[in-house]
């Protein structure tokens, strides 16, 4: 998740909770300059991702730029990269990036030809089921079946939905039937019961990509696997170490607080009756006020089946 699950989050999460089989970077946006920004470089440097499996995610509309970035990542030791065809942001799709590429299947095929022919690494893809209609998915599946995709992660909404409405599980059922690549489900797995419902309805599901649910409940992977539920003590340790890392890296008070407040948009969902302390967190202007508000929210019980509330 862009701006939340960065390298600090990944390192602290894997220390205190059941780690993900693979973490994905916030998307990197290679351009014709063929330079990674300092921020992008910090995200992917192997020394910043010790002890976890990391898959860099690329968002671009130029096959040569993708191939260049994949080559740079291969030189760092990465054997696999992820192509983001799922981002629905208007500023992204207007440039035919992310899910903006799905509406032009000729352009999509030309792009995929270029990256699969030119890249020396394995490529996984995250996609949506279409641009404006789920009826588009059958055609997209035919296209994806022509390439050696390492894994196809499907967010079961169309681009125009953004994150509104329910995921289209009939599209997931179709994907399980017709797609050749190994599949990964994505969409509204916000807590352990929602994962259980999906796996009960579609037991052939082999993988799930978590987003907002994991940001709200860092114990979610363990809970889905039958492990211990989220508890306040472990969550507080997670928060305190993450805060210390972010403070060391960011330094300045205002951007530090902005970063932590964004995280609390998700973490706050896992506490009962959290509206008042969350408001205090969001209104805090100093680190002292912020930490005082955080102490207050930790006096509230953690919700049973904690997770994101839409």
Q: What are these language model-derived features?
A:
Residues 1-310:
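Flavin-dependent oxidoreductase catalytic cores
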